[in-house]
Amino acid sequence: LHKEYRRQRQMCIRDSSVTVLEAASHIGGRCVTDNSIFDIPFDLGGSWLHSADINPLARIAEQKNFKLHKKNWSNTWVHSNGVSLTSEQIREYVQYIEKMWQNINNSDASKKDLSVEKLLPKSKWKGIAKNQIALMLAADPEVSSALDVFHFTNSKGDWLVENGLGAFIKHLFNDIGVVTDCPATTIDYSSNGVKVETPEGIINSKYAVLTVSTGVLANEKIKFFPELPIRKKEAINNLPIGLLNKIGFEFDLSWQEAHQGQTADYLVGERDFCSIEFGFYDSNIAVGFVGGRFAEELEIDGLGSATNFCCDALKAIFGNKIVKFINKTTETAWKSNTNSYGSYSYALPGGFEAREILAETLNDRLFFAGEATMSNSQATVHGAFLSGIKVAEKILAIDTAN
């Protein structure tokens, strides 16, 4: 796949003039590394090489000798509604989570597309464990398609890239020019070629590849001429943009009570939930995660709300003294970001087939790519990468035929 990627890229660069428009002020969109917050780089968006065994980006990172952190993560602490679980209870909790995902992943694809919620096994651990789903899907289980999860091609390994995944992606494509702060506002594909209007002027092209989030499409930030077909609009509505926000903590180096691979889960009520992973990049950085409706509520409450909730988790587990060891914090607010309106897509129950519809080309010149168009690697950076290769192959085939 790496060789095929290089071949397709060389052909595109050799035979075509490519202009990349980026609405944000940085390269990478939802995959961006910030070097200004902590002493080490911090990924504000995508940070994982998921399913590393079969992830083409993981192979490229290995071939380019990037340092990779491959340690598995596991629960060391769980605090639920004022009670810290014992080691035996944590073992049962982890076993339930494994069974929960097995139930979803083993669901019969021929059956009606149910919500993830309806496939959760009964257990005393269901109440807390189901909150893990929003951290994976960026949406709560009752609004998420079980078939969408069923079709995801999962494999071993969730790796981190030293100095950030966003920085790695930027390095990978550093020879391709990108115009930042340049959102597309209108796309006219009514005649031969495509006309794209931006604040910087009009670009006329033979083909256009649209990689914006389903949040941008649903909010009609881009006007299309002709309008998108009803079939395409329905697909967009069946693939809402979900929300996963990250809360970063930089601890004083003297604090040594947690290390890489350890995770703490914290629940208040039924769904006020966060999970904190320690020792990112084998450093003094920890990252808290909040997802789904609860993440939206925290974001609406304002900057600092998610950080405060994760601080409550840290104090519940390690005691109030931990606060004095926190040097710096940061938190993301992807729902408020009008370049995405969220983190990544999820499918509504009954909406799994929308991914293939979203990926359909219009008039052999307007192409759709991005994680939301992938039926087996959705919601991932490598899914977005693979979607780009698929579209490049489509363009080359059409161009050759013409």
Where on the chain are the PLM-derived regions?
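Single conserved hydrophobic/aromatic residue that forms the stacking wall/gate
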Residues: 1-9, 13
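Conserved FAD-binding subdomain of flavin-dependent enzymes
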Residues: 39-73, 175
